[in-house]
Regions:
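A short, active-site helix/loop in glycosyltransferases that binds the activated sugar's phosphate group
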Residues: 108-131, 136-140
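Conserved donor-binding/catalytic core segment of Leloir-type glycosyltransferases
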Residues: 154-173, 179-182
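Acidic anion/phosphate-binding donor-loop and adjacent secondary structure
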Residues: 95, 120, 136-152, 173
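Conserved acidic donor-binding segment of nucleotide-sugar-dependent glycosyltransferases
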Residues: 248-258
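Short alpha-helical donor nucleotide-sugar binding micro-motif in glycosyltransferases
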Residues: 105, 203-208
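Aromatic "clamp/platform" in nucleotide-sugar-dependent glycosyltransferases that forms part
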Residues: 216
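Short His-centered aromatic/hydrophobic patch
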Residues: 66-71
Length: 309
């Protein structure tokens, strides 16, 4: 089966999730190519239309798999190849993206959703929508000694390191709240997760005192799953699946949007954080939650095969 993956190409690096999923598909014997979109907003995306048509004429594909609603809308404007769209959350939850995602969801052959709330928001009421949560690579995220991780990163042992869940310029991640909450913590280094390879992120999570998630909206944030795999303490606003992910997990806490609450929790609980503690199970089979990238490939492949029948 030959797949063309359509995704944003505006960042220097391909989205880690898209890249890892593609690599897993290749290991399953599928042929995968990429069409990376240059441009922002509706007209920026649609400006790639003739390049996409040229790509599809140059090489025969069995299926187009688009990530996010705007990519999906572009993909569905050609009628030669079946289209599957994976909706990730911001393409549905953000008002400026919603209408484009809703239109694309009607034009596609079928859809995949990373969270169970998304089909209803798009007013898709099929009896069994395709829900496949984003996963992480368990071969890349695992606990190591905090001291060892800091030594490799050349971080100071006697200072605090708090890692933010994303890049500072992503508005939905709400970095202003995070900065306000930690502003009075002494010797605190605030780490932006931007532009790092996954192996480096594994070191950062193991070396850090805390992962801070202050988002206005999320679905099932991969960074929280990766942090759990690294035994990194977490303070997060109650967004997406975070409450379910960290329930009864030691040194992980939900917070309000009051910066004082986050500060008090960080200072009060900080003395008890130890890098060697066990934080519990990341894969919860009893609830049918799939967190590993490799585990999600079989259902994705089944959806692909059904779409081209």
């Amino acid at each position: 089966m030959r797949i063309l993956i359509i995704a944003s190409g505006n960042s220097p690096q391909l989205s880690p999730f898209v890249k890892e999923q593609a690599e897993s598909l290749i290991k399953q014997g599928l042929s995968v190519d990429f069409f990376l979109i240059k441009g922002k907003g509706l007209f920026g995306y649609l400006g790639n239309y003739f390049l996409l048509i040229k790509k599809l004429k140059h090489k025969k594909y069995d299926l187009v798999h688009a990530h996010y609603g705007l990519s999906g809308l572009l993909a569905t404007l050609q009628f030669c190849v079946p289209v599957i769209i994976t909706f990730h959350g911001s393409d549905v939850n953000m008002k400026k993206n919603y209408i484009f995602s809703r239109i694309a969801s009607r034009l596609s052959t079928t859809n995949i959703f990373v969270h169970q709330s998304l089909p209803n928001k798009l007013k898709i009421y099929r009896s069994s929508p395709n829900i496949i949560p984003c996963g992480f690579d368990q071969n890349l995220f695992f606990p190591i000694s905090k001291d060892k991780a800091r030594e490799i990163l050349k971080w100071k042992k006697n200072e605090h390191y708090i890692v933010f869940s994303s890049s500072f310029d992503n508005e939905i991640k709400n970095v202003q709240l995070a900065r306000s909450a930690i502003s009075k913590i002494n010797n605190c280094n605030f780490i932006e997760l931007k532009g790092y390879e996954k192996k480096k992120i594994n070191l950062i999570l193991n070396a850090s005192d805390l992962l801070l998630v202050t988002s206005f909206s999320e679905t099932g944030p991969i960074i929280v799953k990766e942090a759990l795999a690294c035994n990194c303490p977490i303070i997060s606003t109650n967004v997406g699946d975070v409450q379910k992910l960290i329930r009864n997990v030691q040194n992980c806490y939900l917070s309000s949007y009051n910066p004082k609450d986050i500060e008090v929790t960080a200072v009060k609980k900080g003395s008890g954080w130890q890098s060697e503690e066990t934080f519990g199970v990341v894969e919860d089979k009893s609830k049918g939650v799939i967190f590993f990238v490799a585990s999600s490939i079989t259902p994705i492949r089944s959806i692909f095969e059904f779409a081209i029948i």
